[in-house]
Amino acid sequence: MSRKASRAVPGKVISFSSLVETARIKREGKKVNVTNGYILSLKVRNSLGIIETDYIAELEMLNTPARVGIYIQRLIKKLVTAYNEIEAARVKLVNSLGEKQEDGRTILHPESPNWDKFVSEFNDLLAETTDIDTSKVILPGDTTGEHLTKLLGIFEPFISVEGVE
């Protein structure tokens, strides 16, 4: 992960929907440069931290021939690795700034004295970029799957459809 300057606003967390829309995505050869916010938005959590939407798992459910499926699995492995690194950094940030509870959990809430610092550092983390080293996966034109159109939009930097430019 590389450090980039960000425009963190104290007390304001960047929304994941805006990250998907404004994610910086740049393709150079086989490398795709994306923001950490884009990577985290591939698995959307609710306010309790439970994953509600997992676009990576949905990508895995596409009906493709095995010759394409292997490339999708390679892409998924790289995305999950990047996701886990960013999530570990988020957890480390919460653990360093949050309040330890009697049951061993660490909690950080908007009323916490460290909340503004967390938001600023988390926004910086989301604005950092990550290179994903992968070739673009070309799906056959007859690929089917639930939410296919949405997945094509979300994963556009990494996949395309045969015969479509």
Pin down the residues of each PLM region.
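Non-membrane alpha-helical secondary structure
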Residues: K12, T64-Y71, L75-K78, A82, ...
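N-terminal interaction modules that seed assembly of large macromolecular complexes
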Residues: N33-V94
